[in-house]
From Swiss-Prot:
CDD domains the UniProt entry points to: KH-I_PNPase, RNase_PH_PNPase_2, S1_PNPase
The protein's name: Polyribonucleotide nucleotidyltransferase
GO molecular function, one term: 3'-5'-RNA exonuclease activity
Gene3D superfamilies according to UniProt: GHMP Kinase, N-terminal domain, K Homology domain, type 1, Nucleic acid-binding proteins
GO cellular component labels: cytosol
Gene: pnp
Length: 752
């Protein structure tokens, strides 16, 4: 049974809240929040444990003074992975931790997204949340534990937040005892491998009314979801497919655990009893400024928001904003100052724009570009654009334009991950680039920002379940998505471009995948709450909506989902209908993609040809040779790259089939030898000259001797070197093989 217990050590000032999570047949997990022992000078510090081995220190600290001139809340979240957490020394040159790993950056985003909306609006003091990973079990992922730790530290910090955030990872596990699947909270790495689908869900507690009664409920704030790598095979075996219904069921299954974790944090905060501090708040604009802007701009702005083209609409609305500012600034600059008055007028103008668009969507089903609520923008699909790339594609959806590029290489080129994540290698790598010109702007170009890493991870998660196994396709795969134009969901465009590019590169995907971005707008209309789901949202609709979610999948099931909402809860039917609307769009996009390419093309002439052979494990050392002598010689002679796995699998990569065949022949001769027979002829190489004859190499590791008496073609030879030299090619025939395997050779005399 899931429950919360509290312990207090008054001697040391340590307070604990322990949440026990009951997974039924799959056992229990314990989340423990502890405060009072570590990092006492931080505004809030909580040590969070998952069972006994995973331990994180979460701290929240706020600056004393607000940052001047900011029009946003300066919250930063940092995850510090300490390699001592896994009993390892960092592999870097200086043997200390450097820049954060991809996994740490993704954990930062996972924490920031549900935590940021809980802060009071108008806060301008810098707030820094730092999670230090101090110990981690190889069986556990720390990211979801960090969501709870960061929330608990913030909740007891005295900062103005609306409440605690609870986060949980849910895995749908189907086995012989649970053929329909059971949702398991905080699954171990072993349970994750056995799962069909995973959800990371974060939410908070809200008060609801039903009649005269008030009760507490969980409002979902964020969802990250993905299918397992072997989901296609699991479905064939009878496991449930992760459909839209599965997602809805998983969200409901997560709510009791989120409720438990939030109650544990709230109980901890009550026992710490730190008062909420007073902070100056800076609302974006005053009511007077908004009223003036609304009166001045409402009518014309409503007309401008019907301009379909993004650039034309933005230019027109920006010009009109300058006009409105010039007319109104004189009214407010004496009281506010010119700079503040300008900022408030512009903020009020943007807020009015949002109100106009939302109102027309809810009352008329109006969209900025004239589409219906479920319409997809015009699609453009093309493959094979880049001459020397192994695979390439261009996917366009309205003004969003994504170039997908695929590169194939040997498995030794897969990414080796030096982080605290349970996974240590990555064979399929998806990298996403978002240059400033994609939105018609200038900006910094260089190492990827957190947003780019997050979008790449989402697209990677969407495509990974359909990537063929390393046995079926022994290649490392790097997929790059270049966002060349952006006006709504470049991440889902990247998923579509990836499918096209991978097919063009000859990758035999288990199924094609497409993605779509959805939005939801909600408000009171005539006393009733109305919800409108929008398919294929524009950038402006993303900013103006109450919820956005991105769904990727095949025609049969969902492979990835990401959801963020500002609402205090979404009715189950509204979410189910929105997911079904997304499925219809996904099927339409898949159909358009299939008209251009619906299966793997022939591999590019520039892509390496990789073949595999199996050798006995006992022969691995012999194939490598002393200090790599044999394998280096094979590489040099054939021009092929050779990689050997611990189980005796040998991967051979070559630019041509001839080079690969030559390498296979030589490897088999060495590691899978067949004894030569008497009478067989070879074109061998003289490798050694002695006083009694010449040794000739027939096969790698297999030499024979031509006696000096056989070298002269019937004539007496005084010195072997008078007839042959080391390195010379010599046609020989096996004359005899003795019982010790020693081979006697005779030169082959060409007949006239």
């Amino acid at each position: 049974m899931s429950e919360v217990k509290y312990f207090e050590d008054t001697d040391y000032g340590v307070i604990e809240a322990i949440a026990t999570i009951d997974n039924g047949d799959f056992g229990t997990r314990t989340i423990r929040f502890e405060t009072g022992q570590l990092a006492r000078q931080a505004d809030g510090a909580v040590t969070t444990y998952l069972d006994d081995e995973t331990m994180l220190l979460a701290t929240t600290t706020a600056s004393n003074q607000p940052r001047e001139g900011l029009d946003f809340f300066p919250l930063t979240v940092d995850v510090e992975e300490r390699m001592y957490a896994a009993g390892r020394i960092p592999g870097s040159f200086f043997r200390r931790e450097g820049r954060p790993s991809t996994e740490a950056i993704l954990a930062c985003r996972l924490i920031d997204r549900p935590l940021r909306p809980t802060f009071v609006k108008g806060l301008r003091n810098e707030v820094q949340v730092i999670i230090t990973v101090m110990s981690v079990s190889p069986e556990d992922s720390y990211d979801v534990v960090a969501i709870n730790g960061a929330s608990a530290a913030t909740r007891i910090s005295g900062l103005p937040v609306s409440g605690a955030v609870g986060g949980v990872r849910m895995a749908l596990i189907a086995d012989e005892n649970h053929p329909e699947g059971q949702w398991v909270a905080f699954p171990t790495a072993e349970q994750q491998k056995a799962s069909v689908f995973e959800l990371v869900v974060a939410g908070r507690l809200v008060e609801r009314k039903r009649g005269n009664k008030t009760f507490s409920d969980v409002a979902v704030m964020m969802v990250e979801a993905g299918a397992s790598e072997n989901v296609v095979e699991r479905i064939k075996e009878g496991a449930p497919a992760p459909t839209e219904k599965t997602v809805a069921e998983g969200l409901e299954a997560a709510k009791p655990f989120i409720d438990l974790l939030c109650r544990a944090q709230e109980g901890l905060a009550q026992r710490v009893a730190k008062e909420t501090r007073e902070f100056p708040l800076f609302p974006a604009y005053s009511d007077e400024v908004y009223a003036a802007v609304e009166k001045q701009a409402s009518k014309k702005l409503t007309q401008l928001m019907t301009i379909k083209g993004k650039n034309e609409r933005e230019n027109a609305t920006n010009d009109f904003m300058v006009e409105v500012e010039e007319k109104l600034i004189g009214r407010f600059e004496d009281d506010l100052g010119a700079a503040v008055a300008s900022k408030e007028i512009r903020a009020a103008y943007n807020s009015l724009m949002k109100k106009i668009v939302r109102g027309k969507i809810l009352s008329e089903g109006f969209r900025i570009d004239g589409r219906g609520v479920s319409d997809i923008r015009d699609l453009g699909v093309e493959v094979e654009l880049i001459p020397r790339a192994h695979g390439s594609s261009l996917f366009e959806r309205g003004e969003t334009q994504i170039l997908g590029v695929t590169t194939l290489d040997m498995l030794k080129m897969e990414q080796h991950i030096d982080s605290l994540a349970p996974v240590d290698t990555k064979r399929y790598m998806h990298h996403y680039n978002f240059p400033p010109y994609s939105t018609g702007e200038t900006g910094r170009v260089g190492s990827p920002k957190r947003r780019e890493i997050g979008h790449g991870a989402l697209a990677e998660r969407a495509v990974l379940p359909v990537i063929p196994s390393r046995e079926d396709f022994p290649y490392a795969i790097r997929q790059v998505s270049e966002a060349l134009g952006s006006n709504g969901s470049t991440s889902m465009g990247s998923v579509c471009a990836s499918t096209l590019s991978l097919y063009n590169a000859g990758v035999p995907l288990k199924a094609p995948v497409a993605g779509i971005a959805m939005g939801l707008v909600s408000d009171e209309v005539d006393g009733k709450t109305e919800y409108v789901a929008l398919t294929d949202i524009l950038g402006a609709e993303d900013a103006f909506g109450d919820m956005d979610f991105k769904v990727a999948g095949t025609a049969e099931f969902i492979t990835a989902l990401q959801l963020d909402t500002k609402l205090d809860g979404i009715p189950s039917k509204v979410l189910a209908d929105a997911l079904e609307q997304a499925r219809d769009a996904r099927l339409a996009i898949l159909e358009t993609m299939a008209e251009v390419i619906d299966g793997p093309d022939e591999m590019s002439q520039f892509a390496p040809r990789i073949t595999t052979i199996q050798i006995p494990v006992s022969k691995i050392g012999e194939l490598i040779g002393p200090k790599g002598k044999n394998i280096n010689a094979l590489t040099e002679e054939t021009g092929a790259n050779i990689s050997i796995e611990d189980d005796g699998t040998v991967f051979i990569s070559a630019a041509s089939g001839e080079a690969a065949e030559a390498a296979i022949e030589k490897i088999n001769a060495l590691a899978n030898p067949q004894l030569p027979k008497v009478g067989e002829r070879f074109l061998g190489t003289v490798v050694k000259a002695t006083a009694f004859g010449a040794f000739v190499s027939l096969l790698p590791g297999r030499d024979g001797l031509v006696h000096i008496s056989k070298l002269g073609n019937g004539k007496r030879v005084e010195k072997v070197e008078d007839v042959v030299t080391v390195g010379e090619k010599l046609q020989v025939e096996i004359a005899d093989i003795d019982n010790r395997g020693k081979i006697s050779l005779v030169p082959v005399v060409e007949e006239d």
